[in-house]
Amino acid sequence: MHRTTRIKITELNPHLMCVLCGGYFIDATTIIECLHSFCKTCIVRYLETSKYCPICDVQVHKTRPLLNIRSDKTLQDIVYKLVPGLFKNEMKRRRDFYAAHPSADAANGSNEDRGEVADEDKRIITDDEIISLSIEFFDQNRLDRKVNKDKEKSKEEVNDKRYLRCPAAMTVMHLRKFLRSKMDIPNTFQIDVMYEEEPLKDYYTLMDIAYIYTWRRNGPLPLKYRVRPTCKRMKISHQRDGLTNAGELESDSGSDKANSPAGGIPSTSSCLPSPSTPVQSPHPQFPHISSTMNGTSNSPSGNHQSSFANRPRKSSVNGSSATSSG
């Protein structure tokens, strides 16, 4: 598995900052012709004197450029979630502005325009925020009972859950170490922190978990843990040593066979016929033909002669053929 690469916020700044004011996007607005984004107040003020994009010089509109710009809520949410404290500071600035200028018309604006939206309502989580979470043991039997719509809860099940308050920047690895030290779990066992039935990565922070699984703040962040034996793995060096020893044993056995009197004789145990199997001739198709060398014929064994005693046999002696009977 490949670990997710974590990059610095400064590497993303070119995609999160407005080229007109040099700050992070506030009320991000995108030109639909070229998809370049700017702060709303920055691009509106710029288009009062120009009808072209500040970045690529594409014509926004011939006469009414404000018709071809759109508010980009998705991009703005990304900026608020990536830049720590930006949303909270912006809401404070808006509240201070309307407090200093009571005559400003904010009645038609939304709560966010007036700075009256809290981080909890916007689901924005900062690194220094304290998150409430619950941790309990993952019991497969209890899960099966839940699937079977068994709604009865015993006192033991309720007491298994523990509640913690942790910084949003706390990682799953820190939570695993806390559980190991709190419950004295030996190193021969592995602890998995889970959300529902899915194990979590060690480098996930509580803020990452809240964003990934869309935690709504309607209760503590529900986490579970399980304990299982650590899988033992044989070291590669041990495996290589075993293979080397096996090779040496095979070579030793081969040399012993070569030095033994029967070392050069191939094994024929698998080729021996059984008592019920008839003996086959070297020429199974023509058993009556025998080979001749230098005028002498090679006769078969005594047992073989008896089986073919009554059959005529041809042989050639010094170029002349003769027929003899047994």
From Swiss-Prot:
Induction / repression: Down-regulated by oxidative stress.
Identification of the protein by name: Polycomb complex protein BMI-1
Effect of K62A: Strongly decreases histone H2A ubiquitination
InterPro entries assigned: RAWUL, Znf_RING, Znf_RING/FYVE/PHD, Znf_RING_CS
Major localization class: nucleus
Region (Interaction with PHC2): 162-182
Keywords assigned by UniProt, alphabetized: Chromatin regulator, Cytoplasm, Metal-binding, Nucleus, Proto-oncogene, Repressor, Transcription, Transcription regulation, Ubl conjugation, Zinc, Zinc-finger
Subunit-level organization: Component of a PRC1-like complex. Identified in a PRC1-like HPRC-H complex with CBX2, CBX4, CBX8, PHC1, PHC2, PHC3 RING1 and RNF2. Interacts with RNF2/RING2. Interacts with RING1. Part of a complex that contains RNF2, UB2D3 and BMI1, where RNF2 and BMI1 form a tight heterodimer, and UB2D3 interacts only with RNF2. The complex composed of RNF2, UB2D3 and BMI1 binds nucleosomes, and has activity only with nucleosomal histone H2A. Interacts with CBX7 and CBX8. Interacts with SPOP. Part of a complex consisting of BMI1, CUL3 and SPOP. Interacts with E4F1. Interacts with PHC2.
Effect the entry attributes to changing K73N: Increases stimulation of RNF2 ubiquitin ligase activity
Annotated stretches, region: Disordered: 236-326
Location of the motif Nuclear localization signal: 81-95
Keyword Cytoplasm included in the entry's annotation: yes
Feature: compositional bias, Low complexity: 266-278, 315-326
ZnF bounds (RING-type): 18-57
Its job: Component of a Polycomb group (PcG) multiprotein PRC1-like complex, a complex class required to maintain the transcriptionally repressive state of many genes, including Hox genes, throughout development. PcG PRC1 complex acts via chromatin remodeling and modification of histones; it mediates monoubiquitination of histone H2A 'Lys-119', rendering chromatin heritably changed in its expressibility. The complex composed of RNF2, UB2D3 and BMI1 binds nucleosomes, and has activity only with nucleosomal histone H2A.
Lineage of the species this protein comes from: Eukaryota, Metazoa, Chordata, Craniata, Vertebrata
Resulting phenotype, R165E: Decreases affinity for PHC2. Abolishes interaction with PHC2
PTM comment: Monoubiquitinated. May be polyubiquitinated; which does not lead to proteasomal degradation.
Entry's Gene Ontology molecular function annotations: promoter-specific chromatin binding; RING-like zinc finger domain binding; ubiquitin-protein transferase activator activity; zinc ion binding
Extra information: The hPRC-H complex purification reported by PubMed:12167701 probably presents a mixture of different PRC1-like complexes.
